[in-house]
Amino acid sequence: MYMAIEHAQMRATLQARMGQGERERRDLRDVRERLLQVLEHGRIVIALQPIVRLADGVVVGHEALARFPLEYDLSTGRWFEDAARTGLSVELELAAAAAALARFASLPPETFLSVNVSPETACSDRLRQLIAGHDLRRLVLEVTEHTPVDDYGRLNQRLSALQEEGVRIAVDDTGAGFASLRHVLRLAPDIIKLDITLVREVDQRPRMQTLIAALLTFAQGTGADLIAEGVESPRQLETLKQLGVP
């Protein structure tokens, strides 16, 4: 009797796992279909976030931020996470980049446009085809750290080729963790962007100020520009100015 009960429990567990696996596959199909619908119908909207020089308040550039249909009630990060799960990362990033580049001509000629790309997309020949024909001296490619880099040699080769054509390379979320610092050390970016968590508490925590000062020294020593992301209060602004952030 005990053996029969044990076998019944094993069957129930196996059936539950099979059912869960089927649900996960069905959910993944639904997610992929949602992404394909957005891609096919061009439903990505771009919001341009001004990048301001702290010294004089002049807008020097714009970061292109992708926005997706509101009816799905999903964050931007979730859309890109879903794209990674379904093998559509490069397609979604290129679509967002294309939507951003469509706004390029409307920007003041003295400003630059910053577009987010993953290491995988940065290595894509399709990206080079997409940006061809634009003023590459005004284009910044912001390499995200959300996916691991398998081959820094290949990534460096691709980024160096883009830099030779005038594109500037930025590293996002610097100071957020080891991955971003490794990006800075391995990629030799033209622009280093401070993680928003450092900026958020810069006027309250001396250690944050010390870290930002160290990153500023590093940036100056390597010929890179430093950008503080997410400045929201006058106290944050004044503290960053005192630290020498441009």
What is the role of each PLM region?
Residues 1-14, 82-86:
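Signal-transmission/dimerization alpha-helices at domain junctions
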Residues 77-81, 90, 160:
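Conserved long alpha-helical elements within nucleotide-processing catalytic cores of c-di-GMP signaling
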Residues 24, 28-32, 93, 127, ...:
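The cytosolic transmitter module of two-component sensor histidine kinases
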Residues 58-61, 88-157, 230:
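Catalytic core of bacterial c-di-GMP phosphodiesterases, primarily the EAL and HD-GYP domains
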Residues 24-82, 171:
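Active-site core of bacterial EAL-family cyclic-dinucleotide phosphodiesterase domains
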